Amino acid sequence: MTESEIPKEYNASEVEEKWMDKWDLSMYHFNWGEDPRPQYIIDTPPPYPTGNFHIGNALNWCYIDFVARYKRMRGYNVMFPQGWDCHGLPTEVKVEEIHGITKNQVPRAEFRKMCRELTAGNIDKMRKTMLRLGFSVDWSNEFITMDPSYFVKTQKSFVRMYNKDYIYHEEHPVNWCPRCETAIAFAEVEYETRQTKLNFVHFDKVDIATTRPELMAACVAVAVNPEDKRYSQYVGQEITVPLFGQKVTLIADEDVEPEFGTGAVMICTFGDKQDVRWWVKYELPLIKAIDKQGKMTKAAGKYEGLSIAECREAVVADLKAAGFLYDQKPLEQNVGLCWRCDTPIEILSEPQWFVKIDNDAILKAADEIKWYPEYMKVRLQNWTGTMEWDWCISRQRIFATPIPIWHCKKCGEVMVAEESWLPIDPNEAAPKKACACGSTEFEPETDVLDTWMDSSITALHVTGWESEHDLRLPAQIRPQGHDIIRTWAFYTILRSLALEGKRPWDSIVINGMVLGPDGHKMSKSLGNVISPEEVTTKYSADAFRQWGAVGGSTGSDVMFRWKDVVSASRFLQKMWSIYRFSMSHLKGFGQEDAEKFQKDSLHIIDRWLLSKLNRLVDTATKELDDYQFDSTFKAIRGFAWEVLADNYLELVKGRLYGDDPEGKRAAQYVLYRTTKTLSLLLAPFIPFFAEELYSRLSDESVHTQAWPAVDESLINEEAEAAGELIKEITGEVRRYKSELGMALNAPLKKLEIYNADIDTGDIAGAANSKVELMEGAPSFEYVPVEVKPNMGILGPRFRKDAGAVVKALKAESPAAIEAQAASGKITVNVDGKPIELEPEAVEIRKEVISGGREVDVLEVRGAVVVIVR
């Protein structure tokens, strides 16, 4: 195949479209049967199907695909499943918007159907993007959490954990979003610093400071520090709450900070978690002043029906009018927000379903898992250490997995579904047996499960839990973002331990977030959002994947920059040019020829390259084993561009175009081995490009090939040292030609090399010169031939007379000026007057004479190169 038969420009869109059509995706399928290969199951994150497979998703899936493709090549039976985490509030809100309804205006089943239809369409859109990016997903193991085949497992896990006493139902303070009208877990609370006011209020015996005056209606005690002498005389006495009139006790507790505000604080039900702690500790009464919609209740008296903000404003005004409010000060406060809608959360006491948390067991399991990077484990440890409440798993929504529970109307007992009844929606089907009290009348549980109850069993699902297959837990790896360590990672470990008593995975690899070109988190409001489709349309999927590979080390945040994609696209063209050149010289040379080739006919520079190539394979293997994608790809790119293209190809052109068949054969062998190996090394990262290269070398897919093995016999330090010297000598000769304005292929009469025992053939070809290795030391005579005045010194000193000084210098012989300079001063006559100059005022150009010839001399790492022009 000649260069003219291969297009000069690499057409990425054409190549990628071709292979998307040609690839048989069954080559990515996991074998559930007996298989001699070790399993490698990936607990893939199931994204929320918004219809937009955003760039953060795409980066994570690049990482997953790098691993999946690499592990297949390493001989593993790989499962790269694809899941979709369907349930949740955003879909409900979108359905209401699309259909112009609220969820309560249509039957529950009809609303769920609308949600399912929207979700199915969104999944189709996202699936197309994933295919376009070349992800080697095992679509035979796709799962969709809203499908009965999946949520039956969610329900089954609930039933088993309930029967094992992991799950319970009781009224308890919970985080509540008034806008979403649902409970949320602590892991779903995000915090933001906001400005508020600290209000100073007279009570009848003490003054308190509060940021929540609207909660005075729910004040059940006042607390001070026992060491605070200002209030010690009042501890145990009753105090009347202004405006609302209830009498509360003043208690002493060590958690009160005397320096904050007045040193006296209200205990309300509930302003924050500290209120809950005190409420439990002192068995205080419960006053519900805020309802589920964020409105004030009857307990607030005349403020009933007001929103929280309206009530706060009204109470402050009334306190001021009555003379109770005596000061207000600005305060920065960390406010807990709902992760979905950014509404400040409230803590309400509501009956909910909870999962018990065993912090010690979770920490022990986390220690059994290998974390990449290791420091990310600290995030899980820190989060676990702050857990005070059990996991609230019930939600007051519709589009989610139904809780398989009924409540007996007669005795109030809970009826939990039997596993054989599942999947089931208790709002659509009654229990298949009577209650223990004999009653057959039940109230269905209308709450649904937290979506994390669906996604926290993905590790179980993909390893065959409750299926026709044998359980293969633990999975080998969980790839995920650092933002969901406290949710998805935490809950998955909890559930795996509760249901199977095992860790969910052997390893967890954490990826960072994608930042916009401006360095900020991508958001529509900032106008810095880039979609994967935008990149693939403008450049290519392989260019996008390269950006993902080199953007940052594992766990770090990655900035999207167009210049990185441009650089990636240039590398594809560079590799294509390397391949095009190589293939033009491999006509008639294939795998059979490579197998028959006798390696003892290799030149030093061939051994140098093959040694470097095998070191590259060794490095890439070790780095990928540690999920270091950036360093792996940079090493491959550096080898291809700097070692192969910039040096080896230039050095062997003489042999490839020459008439030495044995030397040419050796170069062909190296080109074949190197091109094929690079195709394999690039396959996990840029699968379309690698397939295009490999298809010209083999009828098989590169993605069904084994990862290249390191040939230790070809790693040769002596060859590398000699090759480096050859490379550097050739580089210096090329630089020499460039500085003289010569063409790089311009002929030189001869190169004489001293102090080097190297193969000169490839230097001769690259330099277009005869080359001789010389014995002994070179003998040089340096003859001064020109005096160059330093006008930087002469100009400022002599000004208008500088020309006369230059003329006087030129009148002297270069040898005479050199001799004077050696003595420390130079004297010249200008208009009959002697002028003294420092040696730095001139530069003496010398010619090098060797053997009676004018030559140029280069020194390269101890070797001396004499150039005869």
UniProtKB/Swiss-Prot annotation:
Gene3D superfamilies: 3.30.720.200, HUPs, Isoleucyl-tRNA Synthetase, Domain 1. A motif ('KMSKS' region) lies at residues 521-525. ATP binds at residue 524. SUPFAM superfamilies: Anticodon-binding domain of a subclass of class I aminoacyl-tRNA synthetases (SSF47323), Nucleotidylyl transferase (SSF52374), ValRS/IleRS/LeuRS editing domain (SSF50677). The keyword Ligase applies. The keyword Ligase applies. It is an enzyme of class 6 (ligase). Its main location: cytoplasm. GO terms for biological process: valyl-tRNA aminoacylation. It catalyses: tRNA(Val) + L-valine + ATP = L-valyl-tRNA(Val) + AMP + diphosphate. Its EC number is 6.1.1.9. It is found in: Cytoplasm. GO terms for molecular function: aminoacyl-tRNA deacylase activity; ATP binding; valine-tRNA ligase activity. GO terms for cellular component: cytosol. Signal peptide: none annotated. ValRS has two distinct active sites: one for aminoacylation and one for editing. The misactivated threonine is translocated from the active site to the editing site. Belongs to the class-I aminoacyl-tRNA synthetase family. ValS type 2 subfamily. Catalyzes the attachment of valine to tRNA(Val). As ValRS can inadvertently accommodate and process structurally similar amino acids such as threonine, to avoid such errors, it has a 'posttransfer' editing activity that hydrolyzes mischarged Thr-tRNA(Val) in a tRNA-dependent manner. This is Valine--tRNA ligase. It comes from Methanosarcina barkeri (strain Fusaro / DSM 804). The gene is valS.
